[in-house]
Amino acid sequence: KLNKRTFNKFSVLYRTNAQSRALEESFIRQGIPYNIVGSVRFYERKEVKNVLAYLRLIVNLKDTISLRRIINFPARGIGAKTIDKCVQQSEKDKIEFIEVLKNPDKMDIRGKQSDALHKFYNVIIKYHELRKKLSASELARSLVEEIGILSHFKESKEPDAKDRFDNVAELLTSIEEFSARNPKAELSTFLEDVSLQTDIDNWNDSENRVTLMTIHSSKGLEFPVVFISGLDEGLFPLFNTLDDKNELEEERRLFYVALTRAEEKVYLLYA
């Protein structure tokens, strides 16, 4: 609390959704309750959960829930019927789901789908064997690059592809920071930390929380005290607006929106 203010008198604003990750982790470490407005919490975002599912499967090959979540992410032509065949074969042979993927011919799966299953299986096994040899950061970055997750979002025409790209990049940054703090820690320890953060989020249901949101989401709202974070060239204003006068002017207008969310005090933060 600042000057005996309650948490709900404060708001922290940022330019892009991906910036919330560092803020959320800091708030959790300090025991500060918070709400995310206009988005979901960082580790609950679909693309982040997909990458985490890859990492969980690499740590535990028996994690069928994670396997089914990402067997066709990014899209590799493995449809629901193929997955059902794999499940049935796994139950018939009484072996783990992951094991049936190395022999798709046995399930009468051929052609591109067979190749896709083989490739997926080989990647998972490769990184499962590397999990104790590489740092969490090295493993995650190499995996994401080999699978092509960032390039998938970079090439996507979906309107939120840039946000999803940024979120995956921010997740990799989070893992790098973890590895720097814990150079001897394995990937499983990072995943335990993420699970703990999620548990803390779900446990604290108080309404007296700091509000975290993008500047766009803050339009029409006001708070006694506002922190505007990430005022660094390339982040706010965004890098791709610096050479366009109209885009740069829009960034100025957005900054004005952020400033005027504060009723009493505003703090400008930069790295």
Question: PLM ranges: what are they?
Answer:
Residues S217, V226-E233:
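Short Ser/Thr-interspersed hydrophobic loop/turn segments at strand-loop and sheet-helix junctions
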